[in-house]
Amino acid sequence: MATNTFKQQVDSIIQSRHLLQHPFYIAWTEGKLTREQLRHYAEQYFYNVLAEPTYLSAVHFNTPHFHNVENSGDISIRQEVLKNLIDEEHGEKNHPALWKAFAFALGADDASLTQADALPETENLVATFRDICINEPFYAGLAALHAFESQVPDIAAVKIDGLAKFYGMKDPDSYEFFSVHQTADIFHSQAEWAIIEKFADTPEKQAEVLAATRRACDALWKFLDGIHENYCANLICEEKTAATLH
């Protein structure tokens, strides 16, 4: 498969499930969510924030040190994944800490973050990414990460704007998680794609990348379905009414 066609297929999968098209995020951009609904979202997504470093650890583990006939990969890939992992967990402003600052600004606390029962869709999100990153080749794991991180810069910009405009969140410390990812994930997703493009060099490997991309996008979409259906009944009623009127 030609490289440009392969990239187009990956991009098409991502665009068909782009998270900014989800009703929950649309409601966010329109200021229709309550702070309580956002808090529930923050508590649920915290499960994924804590799990993200383990996805990277799994890809790092699965990446061979050397490239040969039997194994594709090399130390440069391991180093790139390690840089991403360090970004996630190193220092006082590690990403779980930044997410906690966001959640606390919405009224959450340590107890609500650690004791919130994970929705089935939340459990599915974490389980799906872990399964791909642990049990599939490294380039498929990177495809799952790329499926999400390639969307994040646009999502983060919209979230920051909505938080300031509709929810009075104007302290940069409260939304630093998003501002950090708005920039960092441009580079992360570009690096991930460069590796995928280089090492998914057969039709079979490219098929694995496409399958991982679909699974990741579906799990992310279903996660927002879970938030929307469990915490946003008022919005669902409005949407059904609007659909009926049209």
UniProtKB/Swiss-Prot annotation:
Note accompanying the cofactor annotation: Binds 2 divalent metal cations per subunit.
GO molecular function: metal ion binding; oxidoreductase activity
Keyword check for Iron: yes
Binding site for Fe(2+) 2: E88, E149, D185, H188
Keyword terms of this UniProt record: Iron, Metal-binding, Oxidoreductase
Enzyme class: oxidoreductase
Cofactors: Fe(2+); Mn(2+)
Family matches, as Pfam families: Haem_oxygenas_2 (PF14518)
Site residues, Side-chain cleavage: Y25
UniProt EC number: 1.3.3.-
Positions contributing to Fe(2+) 1 binding: E88, H95, H181
Gene3D superfamilies in the cross-refs: Heme oxygenase-like
Known role: Involved in de novo para-aminobenzoate (PABA) biosynthesis. Acts as a self-sacrificing or 'suicide' enzyme that utilizes its own active site tyrosine residue(s) as the substrate for PABA synthesis. The side chain of the tyrosine residue is released from the protein backbone via cleavage of the C(alpha)-C(beta) bond, leaving a glycine in place of the original tyrosine residue. Reaction requires O(2) and a reduced dimetal cofactor.
Subunit structure: Homodimer.
Further remarks about this protein from its record: Can complement the PABA-auxotrophic E.coli mutant lacking pabA, pabB and pabC genes.
Record-stated family: Belongs to the CADD family.
Protein's recorded name: 4-aminobenzoate synthase
